[in-house]
Amino acid sequence: MKNSVKSEIYRVLGRDFILEKPKDKNLAHYATPFAFSLAKEFKKSPAIIASQLALKFENHELFDVFSINGYLNFKLKGEFLNSLANNALSLAESFGSKKPQSQKDIFIEYISANPTGPLHIGHVRGAVYGDTLARVARYIGLDVFTEYYINDAGNQIDLLGISISLFAREALFNENVQYPDKYYRGEYIEDIAKLALGKFGKDIFYDESRNLELAEFGKDEVLKIIKKDLQDVGIFIESWASEKSLYDELEGTIKKLASSGQMYEKDQTTYIASTMLGDDSDRVVIRSDGRPTYLAGDIVYHDAKFKKGYKHYINIWGADHHGYIARIKAAINFLGYDESRLEVILMQMVSLLKEGKPFKMSKRAGTSVLMSDILSEIGSDALRFIFISKANTSSLEFDIDELKKEDSSNPIFYINYAHARVNQVFAKASKLPNDVVGADLSNLDESGKNLLFEALILPEVLEDAVTSRSLHKIPEYLKSLSASFHKFYNENRVVGSKNEDELLKLFSVVALSIKVALNLIGIKAKDKMEH
């Protein structure tokens, strides 16, 4: 819709311009400050220029045009809105989608939590964001690949194995053991210890030479838990890349770095000169004892990713990784790639309340708020909605009790109620959507046209959400559209009115946009509300 309007305006103006959406839809659907850019050139006030330009659009078939305070305002005509509504309904649940125009557009790596414990609430924001970004990007025609990077080559895996051994000896065999704070705790450790006992027998907990075997077993069990948690919220990741499996590539990647001339040795330690590209200090990649650092593993992984030849790479990280960006981008540059192809999206912190009191999050202490805990409290729909309801650049705080309310204060309830209400009205009218598809919406009153316009801008919202990486604009749109619908419904009699079919068709478009948008954020729209 917006593109059609822009191309028509450009045909008349013949120059590039900015097209905005005024806050007041009663005033106009679109507006441009184009006249302000011409004031100096033509030595006239923007108001005079805008009024003169408006005359060029007289009797336009798509919109009425008028000027206010130097702005050109465009109000879409009923016939145009009706044709757009017909197109939307014919596309049904493909409304707003596009076919892929190319391959290997975006590679998204997200979550990538250490495989030493279940996902906690701090991981969920990146998980929901990454999955939603992939869903919506694919829907608007981009080729997207998703991956989870498994950090399974560091000391934390050894700690997992020792944690399982110590727990088994303490809890299963009633031994008095020292259990330092740095080791992992929690119900999942108990579950894994019991599984290990059944599979390997008691001896594995006492044989230090078998700690790696126990750690690998524990890692695999943790990954099963992580995959199950993700599946329960509808997140399916295409590839699971193991850090350990990439270490065969380490030597080749280090040679590539060395050939760039941006790697050097000092005190038998190997550094990359990341300060050359804005890092705070040069970073160690190989320790003096020959062991690679965590950064070295990450560089190997990014080398492997960039070899796949995607146009753009997105890493979704926690905000505490902000200082890590410069060193990774420097390494990518030194490997001969364009570092601007890597985009890092940071997730700010999440704090969770219940009955107004904060939960403490600490995976190792076994007192973390797990993703599965939240799921059991509020369900997948509320979880997915709340975690993209705010810009990722802002911290997120919410009370799970608020998300259980069945009233307008709970946004997911309010939005679902709008969708269910449309079905309710059709049932009351004893009609189906197909019965009214031929109704003409050209003569809706202003409030009806504005509601229709709001329902029809869904494709623009989706495009903007992806290109600006502002996925919170989708739940904001859903809340706004639902509020507009409820207001219109409360102010207008539908069943039995002279324009019943027109209003039912209008509601069909509203319900379609709600259904499509909810689906894209991983939520199935409710056809009826259950109390």
Curated annotation (Swiss-Prot):
A motif ('HIGH' region) lies at residues 113-123. The keyword Aminoacyl-tRNA synthetase applies. One of its GO terms (cellular component) is cytoplasm. One of its GO terms (biological process) is arginyl-tRNA aminoacylation. It comes from the Bacteria. Keywords: Aminoacyl-tRNA synthetase, ATP-binding, Cytoplasm, Ligase, Nucleotide-binding, Protein biosynthesis. Gene3D superfamilies: Arginyl tRNA synthetase N-terminal domain, HUPs, Isoleucyl-tRNA Synthetase, Domain 1. Its main location: cytoplasm. It catalyses: tRNA(Arg) + L-arginine + ATP = L-arginyl-tRNA(Arg) + AMP + diphosphate. It is found in: Cytoplasm. Belongs to the class-I aminoacyl-tRNA synthetase family. Monomer. This is Arginine--tRNA ligase.
